[in-house]
Every structure is written in C-alpha cells, then in structure tokens.
C-alpha cells in the first residue's frame, strides 16, 4: 500500500499520523506540487481531483482523507479505531462528516473571514467542547474521529 500525501495540509497530516501511530505497512510518498506531480495522467487516474491524499492499495485507489482513515481502520481492526457495532460506526461517521463539512471549512476560511465567521466558530467549537466535557476523546474512547 502507498499513500500519496502533501504533509502541510491537515487532511494529509491526519492520515499520515494514523499510519505512523499504528506503524501500518503503508509507504508514504510526499507529493511534489511544484513539479505538478498531481497533474500527471497517472496521478489523475488515481484521483481525478488532482489532490492529496490518495491511498493506492493494489489496483484500488481511494481519495478523501476520512474515507482513507475508515478504510485503514477497517483493514486493521487491531487498532481499535473503528467500532464494530452499527451505532458506534454511525457515531464515528457523524463526527467525521462534521469535521469535514463544518469544522474544516471554518478553519480554512479563518485567515480571510475571522470576524464574520466568529459566530460559526463559537457554535462549532461549542459543540466540540460540549462533546469533550468530562472525556478525553470525542466518543469517550480513542477512535478515528480523534
């Protein structure tokens, strides 16, 4: 397995951190965007969006960081990062979607729109802080959402 990554971004870093923390058998290839490695025909066949990360597992290519985390956690249940029951899995999915669609979009926009986004920032971090109250991790136990 091989991960094509661009380390400076949060979505790439979280996948790299998961792989490194659990010492998973995944080769990490740091992308060179200056030389437009992500625009080659070969890369665009793996990810038509031309973005990173991408996980290549044999002839299977997977892009989107949360999908990659879920795939790796499913392949490696010994990590204990993905619950086996439907409710636990749905709860992980909820927090992964929330992170991707709400929290990350706010963080990305902070530099340009901090003042206008303060209400959204307060709301979303309030949700996160309330969920973390009295616990170390979002779901209580460490999982892929953390």
Q: What function would you assign to each model-found segment?
A:
Residues 1-123, 129:
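GST-like domain detector, emphasizing the conserved glutathione-binding G-site
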Residues 107, 137-146:
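GST superfamily/GST-like fold recognition
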Residues 125-139:
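Hydrophobic alpha-helical bundle segments that form small-molecule/ligand-binding pockets
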């Amino acid at each position: 397995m091989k991960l094509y990554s661009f380390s400076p971004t949060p979505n790439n870093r979280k996948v790299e951190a998961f792989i490194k923390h659990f010492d998973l058998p995944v080769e990490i290839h740091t992308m060179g965007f200056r030389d437009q490695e992500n625009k080659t025909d070969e890369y665009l066949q793996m990810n038509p969006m031309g973005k990173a990360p991408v996980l290549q597992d044999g002839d299977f290519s997977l892009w989107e960081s949360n999908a990659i985390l879920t795939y790796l956690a499913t392949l490696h249940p010994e990590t204990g990062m993905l619950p086996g029951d439907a409710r636990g899995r749905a709860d992980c999915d909820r927090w992964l979607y929330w992170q991707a669609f709400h929290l990350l979009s706010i963080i990305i926009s902070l530099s340009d729109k901090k003042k206008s986004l303060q209400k959204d920032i307060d709301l979303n971090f309030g949700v996160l802080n309330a969920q973390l109250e009295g616990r170390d991790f979002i779901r209580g136990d460490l999982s892929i959402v953390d």
